[in-house]
């Protein structure tokens, strides 16, 4: 992906004036890009922000981002490609005074993912796992509808090595785990849920345009090295997957519907009023397949 940075001192004055006049830092989409709710970001790692006050100050974060771009800090440019893309689209002077710059890591990532289709995946509840007693949701991004097993999965989960269910439940309730996004082969998730844990899986194909899919993938790249505190009942896997969809489509309002708890099944139901679901499929677990055979 070819990105751009500014080289004009004059553009800095023009850009600052434009931002103040338009109050671009108050744009709802800017707050979505930074995962803001109730005046602060839900992302807890410092590396997600350019400004030291970025977690609580949208204006400072926007101006610091612009300053970094104008100073040619290519690590910022390549680290946050969707932010840069959106800023270019909304600040005319920034688009005018920029030159090409290539980001090898981002190019490799986009080639690997090659997303053309997005599916919400819902493995049903796993009674023996405290983390999955309500089920789980993640996204599958595919380049070909006919070969889903060689697609990639975009997942959000607590980073933990604890095997004691009580310890996991306690830490999960009080946000003592880091929740992280990850991208991994879809067949690994199928193996984990469908075969090893014997969980049935629902797949919901989402009706997203290519531009919306591109935004989702770019934002997943921006999030891959950051974390947010994981809370079992609310800011869990399903809640954080909804952030990706909100960023993908400008008019979506999803996470605000979940104030106290986020049940995975409810996070799927909330997609229906927006006509996001265009098709669904059911993938039987090996145990259910065997049971059906025995009952025939």
Model-based region annotation:
Residues 1-7:
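Bacterial N-terminal signal peptides
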Residues 9-101, 204, 221-296:
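Activation targets extended, charge/polar-rich intrinsically disordered C-terminal tails
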Residues 83-120, 132:
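Well-ordered mid-protein domain cores that form the structural environment of catalytic cofactors
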Residues 109-117, 130-132, 207-220:
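Active-site-adjacent bridging/hinge elements
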Residues 114-198:
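Glycine-rich catalytic cores of cysteine/serine-nucleophile enzymes that process amide/ester linkages
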Residues 123-125, 143-144, 156-161, 211, ...:
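An acidic- and aromatic-residue-enriched active-site/binding cleft used to recognize and process polar
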Residues 143-148, 211, 247-253:
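Secondary-structure boundary elements
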Residues 168-238, 248:
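N-terminal accessory/precursor segments of enzymes
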């Amino acid at each position: 992906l070819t990105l751009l940075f500014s080289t004009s001192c004059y553009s800095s004055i023009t850009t600052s004036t434009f931002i103040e006049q338009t109050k671009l830092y108050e744009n709802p989409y800017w707050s979505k890009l930074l995962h803001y709710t109730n005046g602060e970001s839900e992302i807890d790692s410092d590396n997600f922000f350019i400004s030291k006050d970025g977690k609580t100050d949208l204006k400072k974060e926007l101006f610091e981002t612009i300053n970094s771009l104008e100073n040619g800090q290519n690590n910022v440019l390549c680290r946050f490609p969707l932010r840069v893309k959106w800023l270019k689209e909304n600040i005319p002077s920034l688009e005018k005074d920029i030159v090409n710059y290539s980001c090898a890591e981002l190019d490799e990532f986009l080639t690997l993912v090659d997303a053309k289709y997005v599916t919400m995946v819902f493995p049903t509840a796993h009674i023996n796992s405290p983390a999955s007693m309500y089920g789980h949701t993640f996204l599958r991004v595919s380049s070909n509808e006919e070969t889903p097993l060689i697609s990639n999965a975009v997942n959000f989960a607590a980073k933990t090595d604890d095997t004691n269910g009580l310890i996991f439940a306690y830490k999960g309730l009080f946000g003592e785990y880091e929740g992280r996004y990850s991208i991994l082969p879809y067949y690994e998730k199928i193996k984990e849920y469908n075969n090893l844990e014997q969980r049935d899986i629902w797949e919901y194909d989402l009706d997203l345009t290519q531009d919306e899919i591109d935004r989702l993938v770019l934002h997943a790249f921006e999030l891959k090295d950051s974390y947010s505190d994981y809370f079992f009942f609310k800011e869990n896997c399903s809640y954080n997957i909804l952030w990706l969809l909100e960023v993908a489509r400008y008019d979506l309002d999803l996470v605000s519907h979940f104030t106290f708890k986020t049940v995975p099944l409810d996070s799927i139901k909330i997609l229906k009023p927006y006509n996001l679901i265009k098709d669904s499929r059911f993938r039987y677990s090996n145990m259910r397949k065997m049971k059906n055979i025995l009952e025939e």
